[in-house]
């Protein structure tokens, strides 16, 4: 049976309608793909708690989590990912990537110019509507 991973992603939007996107480093699984920052949900954590913890750990800032945007399951062949994405705002600090190779603020209308990981694409498509 394939490994199943339940993860969350933050669609962090600023006042200019730009969304914070992170590029996975060459050492990570799914190297060099872009994604909405986030990570795995730990045991006894809600998706919202996991998102706040992951963003603080990996990007050194605090967020407020808003409404759910998408809930996608994607089979990568060797493992299956369930990704829940939520709107979010930064409430304290500025994001600094500790694990990703690159980050950028991208206008909603330009999201499709980045090479997103397949599990993130349904959320990207919803944001482009």
Region annotations inferred by a language model:
Residues 1-19, 40:
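Conserved N-terminal beta-strand and adjoining loop/helix that marks the start
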Residues 87, 96-127:
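NUDIX/MutT-family hydrolases
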Residues 58-65:
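Short secondary-structure junctions
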């Amino acid at each position: 049976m394939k490994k199943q991973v339940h993860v969350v992603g933050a669609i962090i939007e600023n006042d200019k309608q730009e969304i914070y996107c992170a590029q996975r480093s060459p050492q990570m699984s799914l190297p060099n793909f872009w994604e909405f920052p986030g990570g795995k949900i730990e045991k006894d954590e809600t998706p919202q708690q996991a998102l706040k913890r992951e963003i603080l750990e990996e990007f050194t800032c605090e967020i407020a989590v808003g409404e759910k945007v998408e809930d996608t399951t994607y089979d990568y062949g060797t493992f299956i990912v369930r990704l829940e994405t939520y709107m979010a705002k930064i409430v304290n600090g500025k994001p600094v990537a500790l694990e990703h190779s690159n980050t950028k603020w991208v206008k909603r209308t330009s999201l499709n110019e980045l090479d997103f990981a397949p599990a993130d694409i349904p959320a990207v498509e919803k944001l482009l509507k």
